[in-house]
């Protein structure tokens, strides 16, 4: 599997954060295209930390993923919510904040110029 990130995000937030951020951004956009996982005016991505570690980021520990997600939420790059149908399911859902979307737009415009 190929993972990518932009150095601007990595410099500001960390490499693990940048890798996770771009993966979440990809899935949020895919969900938007297929009109899935909309709640409270946002389109969301969800997976447990364990699922993220086992399926897409097997080179990261669960603690690295947990810390990076917490950092991205605290840095206003991701919103975190719980929208599970089963009340006992405490899997977090993540979406991009307006700040994150603006940064992604700037990065994409920068890449389009090259």
Range-by-range predicted roles:
Residues 1-51, 98-105:
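Short recognition helix of helix-turn-helix/winged-helix DNA-binding domains
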Residues 31-92:
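Winged helix-turn-helix DNA-binding recognition segment
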Residues 70, 98-114:
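Charged low-complexity intrinsically disordered patches
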Residues 14, 57-61, 112:
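Residue-level recognition of short, structured coil/turn motifs
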């Amino acid at each position: 599997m190929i993972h990518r990130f932009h150095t601007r995000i990595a410099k500001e937030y960390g490499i693990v954060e940048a890798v996770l951020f771009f993966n979440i951004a990809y899935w949020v956009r895919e969900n938007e295209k297929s009109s899935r996982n909309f709640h409270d005016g946002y389109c969301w991505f969800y997976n447990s930390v364990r699922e993220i570690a086992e399926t897409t980021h097997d080179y990261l520990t669960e603690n690295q993923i947990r810390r990076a997600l917490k950092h991205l939420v605290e840095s206003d790059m991701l919103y975190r919510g719980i929208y599970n149908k089963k009340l006992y399911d405490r899997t977090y859902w993540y979406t991009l904040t307006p700040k994150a979307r603006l940064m992604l737009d700037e990065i994409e415009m920068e890449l389009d110029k090259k």
